[in-house]
């Protein structure tokens, strides 16, 4: 894997950004996070065969319009040959047919969902890092523990 895309909508957008950042820090792979609502305004041009795309799906029990829009995004991504890694609530049958890999999280409130969605992304980044040869994921190269603002 040379690059990965991460998509999220609503509270899932910052989760997508965090997932991309964690993958860059641990596996040294190019990754970008995007707002799913912006997919047709540029990021869709990056979609190609076998490109891994992680999608953070909002709860179907929250705002139904957000859920249906991201299911549509996943369909568009799959139609272009990408491989989808979908993080969704347990029992979300709407996304199952379009997920190459489905990572299920327990159902919760919309504002708590980012906490549950972030953990699988951290494990994913750690696993990919190890597969890429970075066995010391607790000490990523070139990262500072603090930043000095001048």
Residue ranges and their predicted role:
Residues 1-150:
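A SIS-like phosphosugar-recognition module
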